[in-house]
């Protein structure tokens, strides 16, 4: 039973992180308001300029008017190895949390193995025999 609960929780997390436009069909989403904070029905591939990488390693964006400009890289306060370490630490934390919850559920559902008490012949009620 707990396996089903864990599967449902994992699937609910996956579903809640999906893009809204994947969940809502285009016909329904076109009827919804498109103001700020609401669902956009436009295809993002039309608005996003395409990118290509030069052999030198520089990324270029193709602008809608046909021009190109060099893509600016974000400046991070952490270096690449530190970011990788942070990602691995978060993954490890999630895995440890899941395993500890599974262990706790296993401990709570495990039947206690108390030794069965055997009645000695002196303790038996003579009227029962």
From Swiss-Prot:
Residues annotated as transmembrane: 83-103
Sites where a glycan is attached: 29-30, 34, 40-41, 48, 56
Chief location: membrane
Alphabetical list of Pfam families matching this protein: Glycophorin_A
Chain positions with Pyrrolidone carboxylic acid modification: 18
UniProt topological domain (Cytoplasmic) ranges: 104-129
UniProt-annotated location(s): Membrane
Alphabetical list of InterPro entries matching this protein: Glycophorin, GYPA_B
Signal peptide coordinates: 1-17
Name this polypeptide is given: Glycophorin-A
Origin organism lineage: Eukaryota, Metazoa, Chordata, Craniata, Vertebrata
């Amino acid at each position: 039973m707990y396996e089903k609960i864990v599967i449902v929780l994992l699937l609910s997390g996956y579903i809640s992180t999906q893009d809204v436009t994947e969940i809502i069909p285009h016909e329904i989403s076109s009827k919804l308001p498109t103001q700020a904070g609401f669902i956009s029905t436009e295809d993002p591939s039309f608005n996003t300029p395409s990118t290509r990488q030069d052999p030198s390693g520089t990324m270029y964006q193709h602008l809608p008017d046909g021009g190109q400009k060099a893509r600016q890289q974000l400046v991070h306060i952490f270096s690449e190895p530190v970011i990788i370490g942070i990602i691995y630490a978060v993954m490890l934390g999630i895995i440890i949390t899941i395993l500890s919850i599974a262990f706790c559920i296993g401990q709570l559902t495990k039947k206690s193995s108390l030794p069965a008490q055997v009645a000695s012949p002196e303790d038996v009620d003579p009227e029962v025999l």
